[in-house]
Amino acid sequence: MPDIRPHYFIGVPIPEGIANPIYQAAKNEPILTFQKWVHPLDYHITLIFLGAADETQIKKLEGSLAEIASEIDPFSIKFGKIDVFGDRRKPRVLHLEPKKNKTLDRLREHTKQAVLQAGFQVEKRPYHPHMTLARKWTGEDGFPAHVPFESGEVSMMAERFSLFQIHLNQSPKYEEIFKFQLS
């Protein structure tokens, strides 16, 4: 029987003023032929995917996340290259990568420890921070070696991270349930 509990993740939301221009530039680039484009209000950098959870588990995690937020100052995130996950001939995911960022890595590690202590499982795959832009390549040729789309010097201040609930049949589909202001 499928688990009907809501699904959640923890992530850093991308401000609308950053998300909208990225969305327009990527979606209007003719060589980026993907079937499903992520709504710009859903742009985020995932820290941890939690999966199905009940209210008790979420409440248990909330206090730990608030404590983490009080220990980390707001920080700048600079975005680098656009890239894909999956076979380059038919990639699954188009994403924008943030440049290496020690504070983002620290936030992820602290969040991971809190999630484990709250009894959640954490994916064993290596962590690759990214902002998903689109899914399901539809091009006839593979993903190009050079993409003229440039994020330029796109940067943002990460002033909070959030616990998101996923609503699969809505658009936008991610709802910020709890916001944790960095201090």
From Swiss-Prot:
A motif (HXTX 1) lies at residues 44-47. One of its GO terms (molecular function) is RNA 2',3'-cyclic 3'-phosphodiesterase activity. The keyword tRNA processing does not apply. It is an enzyme of class 3 (hydrolase). Its EC number is 3.1.4.58. It holds the Pfam family 2_5_RNA_ligase2. A motif (HXTX 2) lies at residues 130-133. InterPro entries: Cyclic_Pdiesterase, RNA_CPDase. Belongs to the 2H phosphoesterase superfamily. ThpR family. PANTHER family: RNA 2',3'-CYCLIC PHOSPHODIESTERASE. This is RNA 2',3'-cyclic phosphodiesterase. The gene is ytlP.
